[in-house]
Amino acid sequence: MRRTRSAKTTLVGGVMTGGTHPIDFTAAPSQGRSLDVRWIHGSESAKHNTDPDIQVHAYDAHTLILRQNMAVHCEAPFLFLLFGNDRAVLLDTGATAAAEFFPLRRTVDDLVGRWLAAHPRDRYELLVLHTHAHGDHVAGDGQFAGRPDTVVVGADRATAWAYLGLGADLDRVTTLDLGGRVLECLASPGHHEAAVTFYDAFTGFLFTGDTVYPGRLYVQDWAAFRDTIDRLVRFTETRAVSHVLGCHIEMTTTPGVDYPIRTTYQPDEPPLQMSPRRLRDVRAAIDEVDGRTGRHPYADFVICWEP
């Protein structure tokens, strides 16, 4: 049993600064900044872990990356909080429902409050969306129940895709306007039927959820997964992508070697960020695997296909 610690967060990286005028997210894109971050990665004894429940990294004044403590939940997912002029969007809500152990609502309220102190608004909305509907990405949804000016969109395919304007035409790319900061949304089934990829032109980030990340790529639908990777490769050929960001790290820095499932200590992690080349590497691996079931390790990821 892990000991209970007082809820705390750590903010590293950029400092939130600004004024009261609308931010022009097109005039000065925030691409090309460093993501050389030492992420919290658990400890040999989860009971004695002293890391914050949530680590927060400010990539810039309007873009925050959160990681859940591995001692709280072994999945240690990454979450993303993006600010626009009219509203912020939180992508995913982590793997733990209880605010006592995973104070996501409190953390987000604090971060939104800091942003609004620097950029006052009469009214400001929080939108909660998901990369897909697996439990380690939606568990914290309930913490936002009753929060004023907040919309939590269900993560199931029917609800999420309808909200984003996605549907039967999987090649269709839709947009989500946060107030001058526009995200592009792509249906991305394969790992999960409801998966969505988001692209933020301001940072150049492509948020791929569990479709592509430095770890075990679990495939639910082989044909859909292949087609999704094809679409993502084509998409990145016409966009300025600075980093591809998934929601987990499961590999070690030794090529082809991943950490054991349910580990709570990963001291030798590779970076979270990937280049668009990783998408092409995954696509080449799909051709090599050719639908064969089982576990197929590659240097930077493992394809896991068990229909």
Please place each PLM-identified region on the residue numbering.
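N-terminal amphipathic/basic-hydrophobic helices that include classical n-h-c signal peptides
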Residues: 1-16
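Active-site-proximal loop/helix segment associated with metal-binding centers of metalloenzymes
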Residues: 153-169, 195, 215, 267-291
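Conserved beta-strand hairpin/beta-sheet module of binuclear metal-dependent hydrolase folds
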Residues: 52-117, 198-211
